[in-house]
Regions:
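Short glycine-centered segments of the SAM/dcSAM-binding site in methyltransferase folds
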Residues: 103-104, 128, 174, 223-225, ...
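Glycine-rich nucleotide cofactor-binding entry segment
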Residues: 1-171, 203-208, 255-281, 285-287, ...
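S-adenosyl-L-methionine-dependent methyltransferase catalytic core, i.e., the SAM/SAH-binding region
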Residues: 128, 151, 173-174, 179, ...
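Conserved catalytic/ligand-binding micro-motifs in nucleotide and anionic cofactor chemistry
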Residues: 245
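Core SAM-dependent methyltransferase catalytic element
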Residues: 174, 248, 276, 280-316
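Helix-to-beta-strand junctions that scaffold the AdoMet/dcAdoMet cofactor pocket
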Residues: 123-124, 220-222
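Mobile active-site "lid"/loop adjacent to the S-adenosyl-L-methionine
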Residues: 137, 174-214, 227, 231-239, ...
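Polybasic, low-complexity RNA-engagement segments
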Residues: 1-48, 294-297, 304-457
Length: 457
């Protein structure tokens, strides 16, 4: 049930439309899955799914789960990164950003990772995705989910957006701000959203959202685009928030929210929710419960200037080459924890046996404790040599990619400047030398499994 404050406010704003707009077509919260293009095309998934789904109106890769008792998070496709379990309307915002391969993309408030996984799919392994989460525990969940989804080109940060703006001014071609909000679209999904809801929370979230928007604006390059979204209905966090932002930032214009896609959904914004400030509410979008989702608000903002030219597919800019070189130089300064003790070279038979065992462990996944147990047995040079030998046998397409050693493990880095930001992951940890053999990481297979030359058809 909605709170007394919420219902009083919304009835005053909507009048006799209140009951119709908030009348959801189902008794329980809508459930859906969003298919990752890194794994499968939506049509392929729809043809092979062994549970009932129907296409979502909010996203071409989205599907509504028709059985309310079905739990997508327990399905093998979930664990394989084929889809992300996501409330249907939550999948609406990311595609509207118009992300293309080669872009630099920032997701400012990314946990648990659903929208970041959509952005990663749009990048198709080309370019850079920086997924940030301020809360440390949620940032770890974000990192884990992006690994499960097989994202190869992500940097996961645990940072304040103000520090990101200071470190990376006008760096990104696209920015998504799915702002922390009062969660009025979560009332049916999470009981805590109702119990903690009050007018003070709305005002607090609106102030925080304004701060994050200002920081995001500083991160966005000239000619870049930004999507602002919430899962709430509060005017201060939606139309009023966007209208106030445009007053503070004349370098931005409000663009048609559907300018990057060939479909539409939901309803226009509401003119009586702008706080008296000018705003073309036909350019923003609301999703009401009666439209099949739990609720969302979306606006698209464009920064003045000429967009950055994107690098050719599969290439790096000169600047990005320097960042990779700096990462390699930093790697050379590390020392093996055993003082450079040579790793024991196994004979051919044991090498094959250990490699097969390592592959099984990688596919099944290992705990951080298991992963770290043998790290540091080899010097960085020995670790890189072991990786290259392993890659030539199992992943020849990766053998010549830049690789560095970080914390005893081999990392395929993404081009990212050294900023002093709190980085949880910057690329793909492919494995480490343990007990004289190279032990691959699970992320290697989720990110690059299709490149493995020793796999079942």
């Amino acid at each position: 049930m909605p709170t007394e404050y919420f219902e009083r406010r919304e009835r005053a704003l909507l009048g006799d439309r209140f009951d119709a707009l908030y009348a959801a077509p189902q008794d329980t919260a809508a459930r859906g899955v969003t298919v990752s293009a890194l794994r499968a095309a939506p049509e392929q998934f729809a043809a092979q799914a062994d549970f009932p789904v129907e296409p979502s109106p909010f996203c071409k890769a989205g599907f509504v789960v028709q059985d309310p008792a079905f739990k997508p998070g327990r399905h093998p496709y979930h664990h394989a990164g084929v889809f992300y379990s996501q409330e249907p309307s939550a999948s609406s915002a990311a595609p509207l950003l118009g992300v293309r391969p080669g872009m630099r993309v920032l997701d400012t408030c990314a946990a648990p990772g659903g929208k970041s996984s959509q952005l990663a799919a749009a990048l198709g392994g080309q370019g850079l995705l920086v997924s940030n989460e301020f809360v440390a525990a949620r940032a770890e969940v974000l990192r884990s989910n992006l690994e499960r989804m097989g994202v190869p080109n992500a940097v996961v940060l645990n940072e304040d957006t103000g520090r990101i703006a200071a470190a990376l001014p006008e760096f990104f071609d696209r920015v998504l701000v799915d702002a922390p909000c009062s969660g009025e679209g979560m009332f049916r999904k999470e009981a805590v959203a109702v119990t903690q809801h009050c007018e003070a929370l709305v005002k607090q979230c609106a102030a925080l959202g304004a701060q994050i928007l200002d920081n995001a604006a500083a991160c966005l390059a000239p000619g870049g685009e930004m999507i602002y979204s919430t899962c709430t209905f509060a005017p201060e966090e939606d139309e009023g928030q966007v209208a106030a932002f445009l007053q503070r930032h004349p370098e931005f214009t409000l663009a048609d929210v559907f300018g990057n896609v060939d479909y539409s959904f939901g309803s226009p914004g509401e003119a009586n929710r702008t706080g008296g400030l000018p705003l073309d509410v036909n350019k923003v979008r609301r999703i009401w419960p009666c439209q099949g989702g739990e609720g969302h608000f979306i606006a698209r903002l464009v920064k003045a200037g000429t967009p950055r030219a994107l690098p050719a597919p599969g290439t790096y800019t000169a600047e990005e080459e320097l960042w990779l070189a700096a990462a390699a130089e930093q790697s050379k300064k590390q020392k093996g924890s055993k003082g450079g003790k040579p790793a024991k070279a196994p004979d051919a038979r044991s090498a094959r046996r250990e490699s097969s065992r390592a592959l099984r462990e990688a596919v099944q996944g290992r705990s951080a404790r298991s992963r770290d147990a043998g790290a540091g047995e080899a010097t960085p040079a020995q670790s890189l040599a072991a990786w290259q030998e392993f890659a030539r046998q199992y992943f020849p397409a990766l053998a010549d990619r830049p690789a560095v050693v970080h914390g005893g493990s081999v990392l395929l880095p993404v081009p990212f400047p050294q900023t002093g930001l709190h980085v949880l992951r910057a690329g793909v940890f492919v494995g480490s030398v343990q007990k004289g053999r190279f032990v691959p990481e699970h992320h290697l297979f989720t990110a690059f499994g299709a490149l493995c030359t020793h796999r079942e058809a």
